[in-house]
Structure formats: C-alpha cells, structure tokens
Amino acid sequence: MSNIASVEVELGGHRIEQEDIDELLAAGRNSLDPDGRMILHAQPTLYTLDGLQGVKRPLGLHADKLGVDIHVVCADQSPIRNIDLCVRSAHLGVESIIASPVATGLAVLSEEERELGVALVEIGGGVTNVSLFAGGMLVGLTSIPFGAADITDDIASAFGARRNQAERMKCFYGSATASPRDNHDMIEIAPMSSEDEGESHRITRAQLIAVIRQRLEHLVGEINAALKELGFTGPVGRQVVLTGGGAELKGMADYVQGVLGRAVRVGRPRGLIGLPDAHSGPGFATLAGLVYYAASDPIDVRVIKPHHQQVIRSDHQGLLEKLISAIKTAF
C-alpha cells in the first residue's frame, strides 16, 4: 500500500534553516497513520513553499509556510512478521525490511531517470510491482496480484505439461513476439508421469507463444491501467524500465513498448564490480539493490537525527568504501 501524507509548519517569513526542516519532518512523523499496517518507508518527496509545490531543496530560501509530501509505504503486518520469523529461524539477523521497488530502483535506474521521471515495472513470480520515480525519489507504488508464474501455469494447463517442464519451455522457447518460423519449430512435451512412457507429444513454438501472449495481454493491460492511476502521463510518462525474472522473457521489452506506446528497456543491476554473469540479469535486480540500500544513508522521517549529529554524505565515496565502513561499525 502506498499513499502520500502532507504536513505543513509556520515559519513567519524567515530564512529556512536545517532546524526548520527537522521540525517539519518530526511533525510529519507524528502525523503518520498506518491504519493497522506496518510502515516500511516514510520518505519525504518534494517540499512546498507557501503553496508552491515541487521544491526539492528548501534550505536557505524564505517562506511563511513550509510543507512536505511524505511517501508512505505500508504492508500488512502478518506477512511481514512471517518473513522476519523465517529469516531469523535460519539464524540470520534482520536489520530492516525494504519494499522491493525501493531497492530495485537503486540497482537499475540511473540518477537522471529518477530525476526526470520513470516507471519501474518489476515482473516477479506471483506479483508485479509498478512504481513511479520523479524528482530523484519514489513517489508512487501499486501492485498487481499476478506475474510470470501465471504464464508458467497457463503453459502447463494448456499442454498437459509438468510445471517444471512448462517453466523450461517458457525460458528456452518462449517469446513475447512471434515470427513465421515459429510454425515450423517443434517442441516435445514429456508425459505428466513416468507411468505414461511413450506418450509424449509435440507442439509448435507458435502454439506456445500464443498461450504466452494471451496472458501478457492481460498483464500489460493491468500495467497500463496502474500507470494511469499513478498519473504517469504526458511528458513525464515516456520511459518505462522492466525488471524482475519475468522481464527476461525474449522480446518482452519490444512487446510492452508496442502496447504502451512508450520507450521501454530492460533494467539490469549496474555498478557492482565482480557480479557474476549468472547474477547480472533483471531477476537479481532486487538483491543487488539491497546491497546498495545497505551501503546508502536513506532519509526516513521515522528516524530523524538532530542537525549536529547529521553526517554529510560524499558522492565521491565508493560503494566498496561504504560497505567496509559498515562492516567496521558492526564488528
């Protein structure tokens, strides 16, 4: 669940100091109402000065009223607690729980894309997350309750195949786009059980792609509706980045681009030196993003440091140095 909480404080026209921003964010923290859910993130987006919206850095400016929109990401408590319990049962500690788009955006989106406006579509196994970035930050999020695993189930049901074989067919022979040659390429499907030896059958690649396309039409239609609901239209709505395991389907970017009428690319983890090729695909983007998140210093109104305790972050400090610093602090 994603929503925007707005808060405003009186300044009396004086120059905005860091203490004023801290006071505003503290007021925002006190105004949060999760409605029984667990807050994962409460990040300030853009500020307002006397009603003028879209100010990214108000420090040093003058205003009678200073406001901020806080993007709040919540989730039902029970699933989050179950995930936490599973990880701790494996004798691992949990530092924090991060919403997938927050981490994935760090791994696959460039700073310019996040500034100008971009939609990030994560096609996972059972859920597709659609998020919107603008002004350098996450400003909207919604989820669609199906994903790439539904394509696998459709293939298994349509051709009487086992799920593991259906997944293999999707990965090796599947495509989001069709060609005339697909009618001549044959795919052999093994029997459902070992007792049915000799009863394998064959289908054309065109038949497989037809089943995949039917599910994709539904999925991309839901993605398009979600983008419109988030306000992803006009000049800001020109760039879409696909990621997640479902984005690895052959021809996926071309198909989505044709349906949405927007520029579409597949997002892969970037900037991590030494990442194996097998782990550099879109299916590993969230894991890579968690590394970035752990090495960064994200702003959250629930954890506000007094001005004299704030650490000035340097853009010149590399990811490796940040990780080493974090390890030294922990041990």
Specify the residue positions occupied by each region the protein language model found:
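Nucleotide/phosphate-binding catalytic cleft detector across ATP-hydrolyzing
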Residues: 1-120, 137-138, 148, 161-209, ...
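Glycine-rich phosphate-binding loops at beta-strand->alpha-helix junctions
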Residues: 75, 174-178, 235-259
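Residue-level signature of catalytic and energy-coupling elements of molecular machines
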Residues: 87, 122, 155, 223, ...
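Short, solvent-exposed amphipathic alpha-helical segments in soluble enzyme
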Residues: 113-114, 228, 255-261
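A short acidic Gly-Thr/Ser loop motif
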Residues: 120-127, 133-136, 145-149, 244-249
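Feature representing long, continuous alpha-helical segments
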Residues: 153, 206, 210, 214-221, ...
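Phosphate/pyrophosphate-binding loops at sites that engage ATP/ADP/AMP, CoA/4′-phosphopantetheine
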Residues: 220, 224-239
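Conserved phosphate-binding/catalytic loops in two-lobed NTP-binding clefts
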Residues: 259-287
